[in-house]
Amino acid sequence: MDITNANSVVSLMNSVLAPSSKVGSLDGSAGDNAKVSIDFGAVLKSSLDKVDASQQKAETLSRSFELGNNDVDLHDVMLSLQKANIDLQTAVQVRNKLVSAYQNIMSMSI
């Protein structure tokens, strides 16, 4: 997933969530008027930043190994590449579910 595609998904979700920004805080019943504030856009952006960081780490390790750096082992490179792949596939599946949910909501009649 290209970072520009990820940014477009984030901007799409922010535009969808903008009208319902008042719903972002939940009253918790566990404490004395405890409030939990959840910003979905920030959580999504943070997750995408983590995916990007794992991709960058895997690319850096791979490049170091290709250039003959003795501090980088092949198994470290392969593990980081697989972790980055799993992170990316997870992000793609989350995106697919979000788009599907958005399409379901948009097709509902009022």
UniProtKB/Swiss-Prot annotation:
Tagged with keyword Transcription: no
Keywords: Bacterial flagellum, Plasmid
Top-level division of the source organism's lineage: Bacteria
Coiled coil: none
GO BP, sorted A to Z: bacterial-type flagellum-dependent cell motility
Lipoprotein in keyword set: no
Pfam families from the UniProt entry: FliE (PF02049)
Gene Ontology molecular functions: cytoskeletal motor activity; structural molecule activity
HAMAP family: FliE
Family of this protein: Belongs to the FliE family.
Name the UniProt record assigns to this protein: Flagellar hook-basal body complex protein FliE
Lineage: Bacteria, Pseudomonadati, Pseudomonadota, Betaproteobacteria, Burkholderiales
Gene this protein is translated from: fliE
